Amino acid sequence: MPAPGTQFIWDDQSQINPIDNTIKVTIDRPINFSAFSSDKGPEEFTKIENAQAFADYYGDNIDFARHGQSLLTAASFVKAGGRLFARRVVAEDAKLANIAVIANVTKTNIQKTDENGKALYRDNATGEETTSSVASTPIMTQVADLEFTLQSVDMVSNNPGDYKTALKASHTHNGLGKDGSYPLFLFTDIGRGVSNKRIRIYRNNTTKYPIVYASYILKVMEENQDGTLSELETFMFSLNPDIRDSGLNMSLTRVVNAKTSRQIRTRIFEEYWDEFYKNLAYISGRDEKEMALCDLLYNTDLYGKKMSNIRVKSTSVNLNNLNGISLLNGSNGRFGTNPMANLEYYYKQIQMVFNGSCEQGDSIYDVDNNRIDVIFDCNYPAAIKRSIEELVAFREDCEYFEDMGTKGLMSFQDIKYQVSKLPESARSKFVMLYSNYWDILDPYSGKQITVTSTYNMAVKFVNHYLNGVSRPFCGQAYGIVFDDVIDGTINFTPKHTPKSGDQKQFFDDNRINYATYYDGVLTMDSEFTAQRAYTQLSWGNNVLMVQALIREIRQRCPINRYKFLDGDDLVQYKQDVESIIARHSSKFETIQVIYTKDLNYDMNKIFYARIQVTFRNFIQTEIFKIEAIRNSENAVL
């Protein structure tokens, strides 16, 4: 019995008859799967919806020299309006920046004082309190000395839980009435590496006294390159993890989490909190339940008054420091400040993303939950290219725009040799091969840099997709021209000369895409997929159209799954599929769905249908026959 799922079978029956050689013939926003290094950001697979989210997570310091074409492509893709399914890579020995706040409670016996601060004694004769020390005994009282300190853990892990465990092991608490050291909460960066982030915590003064519970404002800040501070995020929370306000829990871990913060992660030590406030209440002689609601960070009660029998030490850390408290012990590990300087190791980490061997790497194969439309090569070495080819062959719902690198390829012979070495895994309808590289001005630094043509294609793809992926992804008619390429830097453009012959025909025959000049305008001249067979799926726009159709049907099918294969349920199932087909009908010359009624399929709980499409043809080559005819005066009657 088959497992639940939606399967698609590619049956290519669109073989194109070759033309006689004597005749010269030559919508939602897309999601790009990207892997890159960056100065900061999460290490998990992350779905990026827009350029602001990208900047929040990974920063806007897009340094090509240190992070290469992969980061630049990802940033430019979202800036153009696209979306990302992204994974930031770090060195395996990188460390997570973190800081924890520790509450230290010490029981101390001191002489009792009156409201004016004068020492009190007990008269030996009358037993009454007095400020006179003559014939009297000092009255001693028990107070709790409170000191907040900071602690950071130095270890190789991206899991805040590991840091929490390490902190718990380093602190002791001996029960009520005893001295104790209590970790209260932990802050970490959202991913490993050197961190410039800081946190600041101060009392929430927006509520009137008496308050129901003490709440605090958490500000997340970051130091800029010029030394100034930027405020990134602000949250309100309670130390007490049991507080609910308007139906919402106000604990730090509920308020600051993966859905609410793009900057930090938090952990609280709930069991230590309980022991902390109960011991503080016991030593100071205050009501335990009220103590849990008071402002313990700044030692005030529900009326805003300083709590007696609790003293905050002058050595206690100032959590309200305007410059914030730094996250410490972050490290880039082997990447250092320049991952591209350790290129072999950098590419090892990139490949682990694309071959699924990284942590949670099987996410890349989840076609139901993790949509991918395109993958743009970023001058990757051969091993990474092979991994991406295998990925798109497995998924079948996304297209790989593969470059041929930036080494050599300066002559026709160079390219012919490179083409001869292409493996069969590259010869797929899910791969489009591009032969060009050139120089552009880095949009972030203004410096001249070398990129493969897939960078420019990535930037162009977003608008092209939005305006109709059914259109050919090449040519001046659809704006696939490159006015940002610096003159004289393109590696090679094919020509047709008496000496060289028709080089373009070689590119077409081998399904290699190239750019060339038309009246000074650098234009992407083809959009072949790399499959060897010459069919309608040899054209990239046709494959992209079918993939878009597949994704929409796949998204719809789970809504109807487990409904019955008869009656109204079957009618509704068919109507849902047909409504999707209707929305895509203008993109194809013809499209129809044919339902197959088969008892064996029914018994195995399978809904089977065939979707037949014919594709719209477009003009790639123009043939004009020039006929010279006699004028009427010379015509023979």
Per-region residue spans from a language model:
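Structured, hydrophobic secondary-structure cores that serve as assembly/anchoring elements
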Residues: 1-114, 120-123, 129, 134-162, ...
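E2/UBC-UEV (E2-variant) core
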Residues: 237-269
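A short beta-strand signature
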Residues: 216-221, 611
